[in-house]
């Protein structure tokens, strides 16, 4: 099995940027979460849920970490990561909650860049497992 080289990031187009989300990015993150809900044909979060999401992203310490993906300076994708714990292993685990790219920005390596940023977050930490659920895309 090939282990990703986290010290030499793969090449991404210059138009692609992934960075930790800031409080100023909250409206863009919420718009992307609503975009994911629309894509999944689910109701979007209500105002109370959006308020809790912002609180949890930017509390100290944050309950979830958000990474914002941009293409040509436009907010086009995001991922959420949070730490959990395995009672059986007695070690921390990381959970990848969402990894979403707006349809208009797919095929530009932004999803790959978001995933790589998640792997860089893990790099060097003693994390026994990484959990995520992969669902079959609704448009297949």
Predicted features and spans:
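Conserved glycine-rich acetyl-CoA-binding loop
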Residues: 89, 102-113, 140
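A conserved beta-strand-loop-helix scaffold within acyl/acetyltransferase catalytic domains
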Residues: 71, 81-88
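Conserved beta-hairpin
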Residues: 65-79, 102
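Conserved GNAT-fold acetyl-CoA-binding loop/helix
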Residues: 33-55
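Conserved acyl-CoA
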Residues: 102, 113-129
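A short helix-loop-beta-strand connector motif used in the catalytic cores of GNAT acetyltransferases and
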Residues: 55-68, 95
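Conserved beta-strand-loop-alpha-helix junction that forms the acyl-donor binding cleft
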Residues: 129-140
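A short beta-loop-alpha structural element at the N-terminal edge
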Residues: 17-29, 42
């Amino acid at each position: 099995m090939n282990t990703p080289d986290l010290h030499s990031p793969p090449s991404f187009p210059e138009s692609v940027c992934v960075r930790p989300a800031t409080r100023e990015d909250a409206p863009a993150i919420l718009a992307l979460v609503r975009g994911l809900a629309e894509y999944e044909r689910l109701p979007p979060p209500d105002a109370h849920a959006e308020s809790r999401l912002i609180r949890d992203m930017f509390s100290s310490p944050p309950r979830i970490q958000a990474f914002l993906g941009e293409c040509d300076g436009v907010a086009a994708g995001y991922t959420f990561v949070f730490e959990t714990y395995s009672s059986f292993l007695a070690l921390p685990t990381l959970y990848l909650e969402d990894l979403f790219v707006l349809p208009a920005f797919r095929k530009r390596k932004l999803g790959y860049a978001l995933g790589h940023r998640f792997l860089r977050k893990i790099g060097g930490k003693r994390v026994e497992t990484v959990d995520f659920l992969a669902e079959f895309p609704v448009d297949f």
